[in-house]
Amino acid sequence: MDATVKPLYGHQQEAVLGYNPGKPGRPSHVYHCYFVAAIRLVIEVEVQAGNRTASQYAQPGLWSWLEGRPREQWLHLLRGDISWGTERMMQEAEKRGLPYLFKLKKTANVNRQIEKLWGRQDWVSAGAGWHGLNSKLQLTGWSRARRVVILRRRIREPLAVSDQDTNTGQQVFSGMAELKHGRDFYEYSVLVTSLG
């Protein structure tokens, strides 16, 4: 599941100002897409007003689409980025017995969980240079603790450093950070899942 913002020119229906990273200040539509990733098959696209980019606006359409089909035609797993890992989304999936996997935003509480587990020695290989740990986490706004998978990958290359332009607010390149030999630097990704 994903959302794409489409800037608009002219006077199309539902063309409103909203989150529009490519053309700030332009009216837009948002395309909420549901697709089968493994075979790149789009199963549904909902076109909504440009100020309806959040996943909460797409959820009624998703549930309606699923419930309009026999259970054997349902997807086997819901997967989405950080905007989809909300309490409402997870509760609705759990209510229907539909497994999910969502990436979490690295909020202060998610970062605290990473800090707690950082020094453990039982990280297991997850492929492509990533290592992972299972944990339980209950974030503010969640009704209960849920399983999270914390993934980390060692950074070996120099990193680009960015700043924010004070005039435009845009991200600007400000140089490269060289990594010291003998020190480990990691990037992290945290997933919430109902899978066992």
Model-derived features: where do they sit?
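Active-site-proximal, Lys/Arg-enriched surface segment
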Residues: M1-C33
